[in-house]
Amino acid sequence: MVIYYDMQFLKLHITAVYMVDIAKISTCYNLKDNIKNLQYYRYIYYCVCGMENKNMSDINERICIAGAGPAGLTAAMYLEKKGYKNITVYEKSDRVGGKCYSPEYKGKRYEMGAMMGCPTYYTIKEVMDYIGMGHPAGPALDREFRDEKTGEVFNPVGKLESLSVLKQTKKFYKLLDKKYPGAAKNGHKGTSTELGEDFASLCDRFKTPKIKKLIINPYTSFGYGYMDEVPAAYVVKYLDKDTLTKFVTKDDLWCWKNGTQHIWELLSEKLNSNIKLNSEIKQVVRADGTVKVTTADGTEEYDKIIVTAPLEFMPEYFDATDKEKEYFSKIISNDYKVFVFTVKKYPKISAYLQGNMCRERAGHMMVYYHRWPGEEDQVITAYVLGDPERGITVDDCRKHVYEDMKMCGYEVDKMVNEQSWYYLPHLKPEDYKSGWYDEVESWQGKNNTYYAGEVMSFGDMEETAEYSKNLIERFF
């Protein structure tokens, strides 16, 4: 955001863009002799621009946040930066970070959830700056590709084909910008419902099917679903042109030595907010202009609540409206599993098995991650999309991991840990096309309730954090 030090320029700019009364600017300006910090600038900017934001006289409001993952803690951070002082964050588990989960094995942390980022993770960079964390100092990321049937190393995009893949990728983003300007922006408010069609169909419509060869690795193997099932909007918001380029070229990929969870541990330590772990919300009642939140420790009263926990479960403990029940029942999720193990012989590099990144091969390993190259006394993590509807159980997935690792030449020695994630809450194409997002966005602030978290943006930590940042900018 630009900070205007020249008052005349500020008046001219806002007058030209928003056609507001100069007197209003002058009145606001008298609150401070000069604009030297961001809080006063924002106060003036939002007063005269008539945006959704509340003014700073509300900083004593009691704010409750449900969930201490990236979405919840980022919301708390930006509230505190705006001057809010009475913030309570409830987290039902015994740790912060949500799907940023970095346990320890023999003195080093490994990843069971989010593992990487890149320079386009601007909000995460703001969080890191806030907590005094420098550039991520984790191990370098690299990978090879293996055949899903033989385990042999191969190149899924040959030299001759690479030119056509690059050409179609450029064409795809050019058409996207032309037909759906702003499609890659964070959140779904105002996004064309035409982008509710599945991503594979959009590629066919654009006559750019080969871009899927680049998208599939950082999308499907990371648990976000299949190209022919997921609404295209989710793909293009997560993998905008710049982010995809970073992932494909491996240009300055971020990996954190102490894990992604450490980001949120440090943030929770710095925040003045009251962060309550092991505090599952049992009931929320919104009445008489207040929000009453009940846990095992009793009932507390708040002025506002921000829900970053999964919205489809919200009606189980909220006094949910009929519309909340109807709309949140449409949210679906993926069954994403992570297996952690040692091996008898260690690989030198991580690997994708692209042939397993389809519904027909659900339960098979899509990628294994060798986090600490050259250090054999560490764990390998393998990632699998399950399929409970087809009867593929966690035991089936574990069995396939043993088989697939052996096929690749790295027999599993000992299973150390495993996690089944409720992953990427999202909508089916038909529900996205129905205008679900614009309807839910119209509820923001009603009943003193605000909705955030993965489903309102996307399932990676940058998108969820950026949405929380924008939510605070819009309404607080």
Q: Positions of the model-derived regions?
A:
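Helical element adjacent to the flavin cofactor pocket in flavoenzyme catalytic cores
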Residues: 241-287
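N-terminal Rossmann-like FAD-binding beta1-loop-alpha1 element of flavoenzymes
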Residues: 61-88
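Conserved flavin/dinucleotide-binding core of flavoenzymes
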Residues: 371-476
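N-terminal amphipathic/hydrophobic targeting modules at extreme N-termini
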Residues: 5-15, 41-44, 48-51
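Mid-domain catalytic core of redox enzymes
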Residues: 82, 283-394
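Conserved FAD-binding subdomain of flavin-dependent enzymes
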Residues: 99, 107-139
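Mobile amphipathic helical/loop "lid" adjacent to a hydrophobic cofactor/ligand pocket
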Residues: 125, 129-130, 134-233
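Glycine-rich FAD pyrophosphate-binding loop
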Residues: 80-104
